[in-house]
Amino acid sequence: MLSRSKAKRKAHFEKTRTLLTEKIRESMISVLPIIAIVAVLCLFLVPMQPTLLLTFLVGALMIVVGLGLFSLGAERSMTIIGSKIGTALTKIGKLPVILLVAFALGVAVTVAEPDLQVLAATVPNIDKTVLLAAVGVGVGFFMVVCMLRILYGINLRWVLVACYIAVFLLAAFTDRDFLGIAFDSGGVTTGPMTVPFILALGVGISHVRSDKRAEADSFGLVALCSIGPILSVLLLGFFSDGGGGAAEITQVSFDSTTGIGTAFLQALPVYMKEMAMAMLPIVAIFLVFQVFVFKMNTRSFGKIAVGILYTYVGLVLFLAGVNVGFSSLGAELGAALATGETEWLLIPLAALLGWFIISAEPAVAVLEKQIEEVSAGAIPGGAIKVSLSVAIALAMALAMLRVVTGISILWFLVPGYAIALGLSFFVPDIYTAIAFDSGGVASGPMTATFMLQFMMGVSIARGGNVLTDAFGIVAMVAMMPLLSIQAVGVIYQRKAQRAAQELESYGDCDIIELWEEAA
């Protein structure tokens, strides 16, 4: 009996190790293009201090391991918690309880989102806690909207149209310093912490309904929840002063490798405390449900607890790696390229980085498979990958163009969203839901970390306004799947219709010829 128990533990350990290795490999594939391009730039175009480059590499290693641990932990804890709470709420069946819990969960999960933590720490002149609270409340409110939409079967397309009309009306009157931050907030909230949790919760709630549209209506939650932060930060702009976007690059230098080690060791306790506070609400909600509703056995509870621990450790490593290693080199590299003879490289380099970042993003493979399944194989995954790569490269190039020229982000977002919403009338609802849900796929951790810092470095070196020029890159990237996925859907739908018409026409001719022969 003892040997059997030992064998089970060993098998579980091996399975966990295999999964962790796979998650770390996926993280490495995401980060590797950035490391390679930065290495080439530092070796041949803009030499950097060796200690700064070493700090960047150590930070990259921490990001890879941190993202791997976080992904495994979120899969083993947050996704399961979301699914169980969704199922439990359907059994309770009381609308006020469902809406209250949905709001609380929206706030709790959002404030622990790693990409949002990075963005909030990067924004100058705006208190981090205030920004996190505003974004959390925005997501919480729209979680309530999502639940109502699922329960009452309201068409996603019209909800999106109404919400984006409200967004751009507010954007027309708010402080322009808040535009980029607001739209970036919408992009970073649909990250690796929030998305699995929200999707699992939505699927659980959709089981309340038994009609054919229930499963399809479980899509679109991420799309709507990303609108909440945009509206809440735009509203924040009416009551807060952006401070003119003044910022400067903090010169980071280390005398030796000992100094590098000290910097990371000093950062770790800070992020341990921050993430403990950030994860406390979601852990508290889970414990309340465990005591009064779930009542899981010790083994099941232990698995989720270990998953939460993985998530916590992963977040701490990720944030320390980003803020100590990635950020400083990204900003200095951008500033160095923005001055002198290398200035012409900025836009093509941004496009190149965009192409490789999305090509290496593991979540894109999941998206490709999802669209292939929904289209019954009519839309090949390769078409989605190429369209996304081109779209994100274009988004990065346009974002850099904004930094260089100071063009308002609204000149890109208003027509972009107008076209995206227009396309939604020409594709099946499920394509629209998947496209709007997929903004977070494109705006992955590398966009919110390295690329934002890179753009900020360029803006500061050119004497620009960081808030109006550099911020908005995540929003530009997050908008592209809305356009590319729906556009591919329209193209393939037209092809299918033409093929069906040709087949029908061919069949008609066949029948006529047969009758003529018989005569």
Feature roles, as predicted:
Residues 1-27, 31, 82-96, 210-214, ...:
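Intrinsically disordered, low-complexity non-transmembrane regions of multi-pass membrane transporters
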Residues 1-5, 146-161, 177, 181, ...:
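Juxtamembrane and boundary regions of transmembrane helices in multi-pass small-molecule transporters
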Residues 30-45, 59-69, 101-108, 138-149, ...:
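Hydrophobic core segments of alpha-helical transmembrane domains in multi-pass membrane transport
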Residues 40-54, 74-82, 108-123, 142-153, ...:
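Transmembrane helix-loop junctions in multi-pass membrane proteins
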Residues 53-58, 250-363:
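Transmembrane helical segments that form the transport core of multi-pass membrane transport proteins
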Residues 56-68, 125-137, 184-198, 250-251, ...:
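Structural signature of hydrophobic alpha-helical transmembrane segments
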Residues 75-93, 118-124, 326-341, 363-379, ...:
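Flexible loop linkers connecting adjacent transmembrane helices
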Residues 87, 95-166, 343-424:
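Helix-loop-helix junctions within the multi-pass membrane cores of secondary transporters/permeases
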